[in-house]
Amino acid sequence: MLDVFITSRVRRKIVVVYAKYPDFHTHVRGLAKLIKEDPGNIQRELKRLEKVGFLQSEKQGNSRTYFTNKQFPIFKELQSMVIKSQQ
């Protein structure tokens, strides 16, 4: 169902992880291992999702950690869609 609204496979996987686990914090390489995608593609999509406000990030040493912005205007709706599509 989400593939109709989110056409990028990598972006869809990222949204599913962060909507399903809103307290999840990780860096690009950790997420790449989790969803089995190329870190370069993940980095690009994380930046896009941060730009629209779905994700936030903070710099920790040489890496950047990404986490869900629970104040994102449609976060609850998106989370509900993800949970329903997983059932």
Explain the meaning of each model-derived region.
Residues 19-23:
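Short helix-capping/hinge SLiMs at alpha-helix to coil transitions
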Residues 29-33:
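A short acidic, leucine-rich amphipathic alpha-helix
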Residues 50-59:
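A short, conserved structural fragment
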Residues 46-47:
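Short, hydrophobic-biased segments on the C-terminal half of alpha helices
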Residues 65-87:
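Conserved segment of winged-helix/HTH DNA-binding domains
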Residues 42-43:
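Helix-turn-helix DNA-binding helix
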Residues 1-15:
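Short alpha-helical segments that sit at the start of domains
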